Amino acid sequence: MECEEVQAIVIDNGSSVCKAGFGGDDAPRTAFPSIVGRPRCTGFIVDMDKKDSYFCKKNSCFMGQKDLYIGDEAQSKRGILNVKYPIERGIITNWNDMEEIWYHTFYNELHVAPEEHPVLLTEPPLNPKANREKMTQIMFETFKTPAIYVANQGVLSLYSTGLTTGIVMNSGDGVSHTVPVYEGYILRQAILSLDLAGRDLTDYMNELLTDRGYYFTTKGEKEIVRGIKEKLSYVALDFEAEMQIASASPALEKSYELPDGQVITIGNERFRCPEALFRPYTGIHETIYNSIMKCDDDIRKDLFGSVVLSGGSTMFPGIVDRMNKELTALAPSTMKIKIIAPPERKYSVWIGGSILASLSSFQPRWISKEEYDESGPSIVHRKCF
């Protein structure tokens, strides 16, 4: 099967959300939580003669309850499930659950047979070699895909903007990365990772709300906190000045209605939460600067002039102006700073994958089943770079 004859499947597995769809499309067909849930209450069958008991997968406490829930269904039933994220800080850590998510993606979300479509998977910039091989192996041996490609998330974000040179700050739910790219080539020695992203900001917002007297303790309630963060937070251009405004008047306060109808009010928490992206520790602006300074002198100008923001944790209003201000203060005065923040940047990685998979010039880069059978999983290091 020639890869250009059928649409490729593009899957961007994030720490929090799985985005999937077809190469050549403008947006993913589906975006669902990257979670797997199993019932907390499971049954036991007891043999009174042998005084023995054993776990029975099919004997659940609730009639009709399944053994496994994935994505939105798992999210809606969090109260009765043990929920796990198979991807931690961008890296797949639970392969059995990851297989379940991929199965769900193919058959329940996209309604396709994976053996009929080439599959492009995204990977974080510092993905371990063993993980790249495992992804390749599972796609060929479990899902029988005819071809596969594993693509760097940072490069895909850059491609989504139409650029081949620039530095990407990709900040999702689990991890933030800077990836400098020059004429399509990743400058690997300058990739930097920051274990500060959306989930950390949600936890911080929860702390701020607790200080204000609002308590959210269960996993389900923490999803409410995430919603508050996403709907009401913004990045202050000048944090100290914004704090003074917030203390002097209620102008910055906003109300938020909880699912039970209760209305809460928050003020400076709105900008104090995403301020964690910039301080008190090494911020995303300093990480971008440090990454650029690890590159050769003669390309730094190009990188400072094409700073691409990508991922859900770059969606806060005000982040572009603040990033411009911070990088201008850090960079040499001769450097012109340009921040590129497409409105659809929450899905930039997936969009870049969709563009790449649909290019006729890309087709020879797929790893075919024949190549895999001949070389094994290590073929991924030779063809996907």
Curated annotation (Swiss-Prot):
Which Pfam family, an example, fits this chain? Actin
Where is this protein localized, as stated in its record? Cytoplasm, Cytoskeleton
What keywords tag this UniProt record? ATP-binding, Cytoplasm, Cytoskeleton, Hydrolase, Nucleotide-binding
- EC main class here is hydrolase
Cellular compartments per GO CC? actin cytoskeleton; cytoplasm
Q: What is its main location?
A: cytoplasm
Q: Which EC number(s) are documented for this chain?
A: 3.6.4.-
InterPro entries in the record, alphabetically? Actin, Actin/actin-like_CS, Actin_CS, ATPase_NBD
Q: Name one GO molecular function term.
A: structural constituent of cytoskeleton
Which terms does the UniProt entry file under GO BP? phagocytosis
**Would the keyword Nucleotide-binding turn up in this protein's UniProt record?**
yes
Disulfide linkages recorded for this protein, renumbered to the chain, are none
Reactions catalysed, as given in the entry: ATP + H2O = ADP + phosphate + H(+)
User: What is the stated purpose of this protein?
Assistant: Actins are highly conserved proteins that are involved in various types of cell motility and are ubiquitously expressed in all eukaryotic cells. Multiple isoforms are involved in various cellular functions such as cytoskeleton structure, cell mobility, chromosome movement and muscle contraction.
Q: What does the similarity note say?
A: Belongs to the actin family.
Q: What is this protein called?
A: Putative actin-25
What is the scientific name of the source organism?
Dictyostelium discoideum (Social amoeba)
